[in-house]
Structures are given as structure tokens and as C-alpha cells.
């Protein structure tokens, strides 16, 4: 099949991802609007946060590794087979985590949301095949279809059944039906029948393990901060915080649209010794990230309170001050994600692990101190401080990798 240009790939990926992220945000709007009180919003927030732990294990950072596999160490069949293995392991580990750390009322919503994320996670490896063949238009169209279906299903579940569990169940059903589209398109590019071999699975498992642990620890920073806020200040406070800060996640997702299609190009430039091209692309990417957040920051300063009041009502608008610390937190989260994925594409798994481990260790005392001192804003402060530490370490590792090639 005909490959698309880089600009076309970035456009389709951006449109689909932005729409998908917007629909995910609208879910948090709907749960706040259609539910009585903020308990359901708080429970959904916890389910989303816990699912991020599953996502790190299920994804196993394979997408970044896969699209930068310029020497084709593994086939599409092996990537798909390995993804099925990581989904199963991630599901079991996350269920155990939920049983230990979450209340009984949260277990069913968490389980259902994990099923939703499992479908999402499987589609990701298919999109990796699409990206390798420069057909990210398939990715964009898939996200448009899946987002529309899960948003409609979630709305029906809340509006007609007044049940968060029914609403999430609708998301699960619609997502699994939409996967048929992805399978149909991707198998036209490559053989995607799962291939599971002990030797290849073990090698891929051990190669990516440090990065996976690192990115799981990265997710723990956010999950722990939010859970502690809920324990210290109650579910309503967590619901308010999650509702106010969720629009910022869309901005954070925009950062991913910028760099995700470029990871293979970064890897090729580094592998072939074109250091000047690598550094130039790195500077352009970082500049684009700064511009995105600067524009959004100005927008929130100008109309943030009015926007929150219009969408969520006066109760949420009264807490509009949370959005500024949340924006800083989101910017740093995007930076950590980019630098981590970049190190993975350059095969520095240990650097990804070390940076995120130290950041996670910093987050525990920071969360206790800052949430106690600043309440809901303390959650964003603790995450931001942790991710500043991570970013400094990851940048140091990146310089160590690139500098010798630049000198040579």
C-alpha cells in the first residue's frame, strides 16, 4: 500500500489523537454534570489513575521501541504476540494493586475501566505497525471511530441508567467492536497473527524491563498524589481537582502528537551518526512543546474561569485557581514522557529507569508535605517537583549519549 508523507502522518495522528483526548475529557465533564455530587467523578478519576499503572505494563513501552526498530529485530507478529502477554500480566498485577490499595466500592469501576484500557492497549501495537509503514491515517481514523462510539455509549449509560458501571461497560463494548476496523486495515500492511516464542519474548521482556519499571514509577507519581488527596481531603475534593485539571490533559496529549511520529526519525539520525540532524530535530520538538503550553497558558489566564463556569458550573469555577499549577504539572509530564520515549528509541533503558525511580522516591514525602500545606494545589506541586527532578536526570543521560557522536 502507498505510504503517506510525514506531514500527512502527523496531521492524521494529531486530528485523531486530539479528538480522542477531547472525548476522554468530555467523559469527565459528563460524569460531573450527570451525576449527583462529585463522588462518581472521584471514583472515575481513581479508576483512570489506577489504569495508568496497567497501561504502563500492558504497553511495555513497546510502541517507542517498535517504531524505532529500524533494523527489524522483531516481526509484527512477534510485537503483537508480546503485547497480548503484557496485557494479561498487567491486568493481573493491577487487580492485585487495586485490591490492596482501593476501597471495595471502587473495585468494579476499576475492573471495567481496565477492560476498556486493555482494548486501547491492544490497538496501540497495531498502530505501531501502521506507523512503521507510514500509514498513520489508519491510526487517526481508528481514534475518530472509537472515541465517537465510547462517548455515545458512556452518555447513554449515565443519562438513562444513572450508573457509572453501566456507562463504562458501554465504553468496553464499543471499543472492542471498533477493533475490527484496526485489524482489517493493519493486516493489509503486515502479517499480524500473534507469534509467541519463549526466546523472543524473554529477550524483549528483559530489554525493555528497566524502561517499563521506570515509566510505571512515573505513573505512580500521579496515582499516589491523587489517591493521597482523596484520603486526606475526601472524594469530593479529589473529584473537584480531577474535573478542573482534566482539560489540561488535552494539552498534554497535544505534545505527544508532536513527537510520536518523529521517534523513528530520531532513532535513524542517531544510528547513522547524523548528530546535527538529531540535535536540530530535538530543538525544534522542544520549541514546539514550549509554544503549545505557552499559548494554552495565555488562553487559560484570559478565559479559564469563564470556560470552567460554562462547562462545569459555579462550584468548579470557584476552584479555577487549580488550573495554573495543573498546567505546569501537565507541561512537565509531557516533557518527561518525551524524554523517556526518546531514551527508549536510543535504547537507553537504564537511563529511563534511573530518572523515574528517583522522581518517584521524591514524590512520596513531597506529596505528604505539599498536600497537607496547600490542599488540592499541593497535588500538582508534588507532581511538578518530582518531574523536574526526572527531567534533569533524563536530559543528563541524553547529553551523555549524543555528545560522543557529536565530537566524533
Model features per residue range: what roles?
Residues 36-41, 99-113, 235, 301-331, ...:
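Interfacial segments at transmembrane-helix termini and the short loops linking adjacent helices
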Residues 7-20, 47, 53-98, 108, ...:
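Membrane-water interface segments that mark the loop-to-transmembrane alpha-helix transition
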Residues 3-7, 64-74, 119-143, 328-355:
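Membrane-interface junctions at transmembrane-helix termini in multi-pass inner-membrane proteins
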Residues 4-60, 91, 151, 209-236, ...:
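Signature of the first transmembrane helix
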Residues 55-74, 132, 244, 248-273, ...:
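Helix-loop junctions and terminal segments of transmembrane helices
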Residues 44, 48-55, 218, 241-267, ...:
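Transmembrane helix-bundle signature of multi-pass secondary active exporters and lipid flippases
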Residues 107-114, 140-189, 207, 358-362, ...:
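Hydrophobic alpha-helical transmembrane segments
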Residues 1-2, 6, 137-142, 164-171, ...:
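Interhelical loop/hinge segments that connect adjacent transmembrane helices in multipass membrane
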